[in-house]
Amino acid sequence: AGLVGSASYENMSGGGGGKAIGFLIENADSNHGTLMVNSTPIVIRSLTGVFPHNFRDLTLVSGTIGDYAAMVVGKDSPINSMDDLLAAYDADPGATAIGGGSVPGGMDHLVAAMVMEAAGKDALGVKYIPYDAGGKAMAALLSGEIAALSTGFSEAVDLANAGEVKIIGVTSEERVDAAPDAMTMMEQGIDTTFVNWRGFFAAPGLPDDQLVMYQDAIAKMYDTPEWEEVRARNGWVNIHNSGDDFKTFLEGQEKVIGDLMKKLGFL
């Protein structure tokens, strides 16, 4: 989009994001030119102690986008709505498992528990089966090992467009243009919303003038056609909050997720 002259990217994997966070903190003075992209798991993994730091140990630059969560079923499943899934669960809770791509207590599990609790079910009673790869989760869905899959909306859209799944519920307040026929949870009487945000963080101690420069560049990004093309293609929603507003947003999510994790016995 021409907003910066050049930029490089490094995928610093390891420790569920902890390696990148630790690197920024431990080498703060020499990394004022580095931004880190992170998402909801920084809140979850800090709460559970997967790594010793949390978002407060970094410079909060800007929240950028959100990816809603979705519940999907196999293309040939008799389940076509959340009402159908809840009816199947009421008839046989043990045989109505929900799968996901994260460990128990991870984001996919928490979303499934949040949705089921909002539907009046006991979140502790939901049978959740984790899978370490999307292919394994899809195989389980198609074989009937799980009745539904908790996943990100953008991934659900890709699977639905490929004819592999049906989206039976989205955790957005309103329908999303990327899948206009997919009903929200709210439409189906399930009073819950959830968004997996993505945002930019910087090393602690970042000078104020450099922070403002980064925030201004991100704000300008939203007005570019290049950004809109990427956003629409992925079904993302713009969630722009900088500095203190970003902190307030993260603290609110930390409380909601923390309360649910305590109820589920993960804290």
Q: Where is each model-derived feature located?
A:
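Hydrophobic residues within well-ordered alpha-helices
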Residues: 24-25, 112, 141-142, 160-163
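N-terminal (or domain-start) structured segment
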Residues: 1-57, 95, 121-148, 238-241, ...
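C-terminal lobe and pocket-closing loops
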Residues: 155-223, 234, 252-255
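Mature extracytoplasmic/periplasmic domains
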Residues: 223, 227-248
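Stable alpha-helical elements in mature extracytoplasmic
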Residues: 16-20, 40, 81, 108-111, ...
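A ligand-binding cleft/hinge motif common to bilobed small-molecule-binding domains
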Residues: 40-50, 113-120, 147-180
